[in-house]
Amino acid sequence: MPGAIRDLINPVSSAASASKEDTVNNVFFLEKDLFPGSKMTLHFTRATAGAALLPRGRADSVPFASEKLPEILSQLSVPAGSPAADAMRSTLAECEAAPQAGEAKRCATSLESMVEFAASSLGTRDVHAVSTEVDRAGPTPRQAYRVEAVRPVPVSGGDMVACHGMAYAYAVFGCHTTTAAAYTVTLAGADGTKAEALAACHTDAAPRVAEAYKRLGVAPGSVPVCHFLPQDDMLWVRN
């Protein structure tokens, strides 16, 4: 069972979230720099911050729409105007935004709905998930990691479904189809932490990736640009 799913069933407590720029998902690098012996500074985090996974029946009983936010906050006992309420507002807006051209997307509020979206998008129920695994409980420090091994994630058919943990009162995942290349990377931290981290490498010019190209000083779409996935993100692929 992937760690991301295991931790939804048995939520992991988390310290306060790091700044957006400090998280592993926002450290971009070129695919050519992903090789044994390379080093980079990373901070593995959880967007869901230990939020519990709701049974499908319970999740389906709670509204999930921006226009219903006051009702949602009341049902979930989240104070209006609080940082948590603001984060939920942002998540709902992101979930309601139109998908990018050629992309299918859905925000999954239960494990069952996530599996259904992955299966329908990949054209088969014979799917499995992979996620980043870190060998220590709780938050890890921002530190230097050394790449020990790099292995491609086998992807039958060339496409997969990525599901990203989102800030909400319970576990919510923003899922979308992608043709990014994926790798499992063995990392060793300066403090002895070991990680089997998922890296996704993109060649598209989506706004977020386009900004990464600018940071790295290369033309958009010219070479693959990569980032690691946080511990509560998942990639669904065909078996």
Swiss-Prot record:
Keyword terms of this UniProt record? Signal
Task: Fetch the Pfam families from UniProt.
Answer: BURP
Q: Which domain of life is it from?
A: Eukaryota
Q: Which residues cross the membrane?
A: none
- Secretion signal span: 1-19
- Tissues and organs where the protein is expressed, per its UniProt entry: Expressed in leaves and shoot.
- Note the InterPro entries from the entry: BURP (IPR044816), BURP_dom (IPR004873)
Q: Where is the BURP domain?
A: 28-239
Q: Does the keyword Signal apply?
A: yes
Q: What is the protein's name according to its record? A: BURP domain-containing protein 6
Identify the species of origin. Oryza sativa subsp. japonica (Rice)
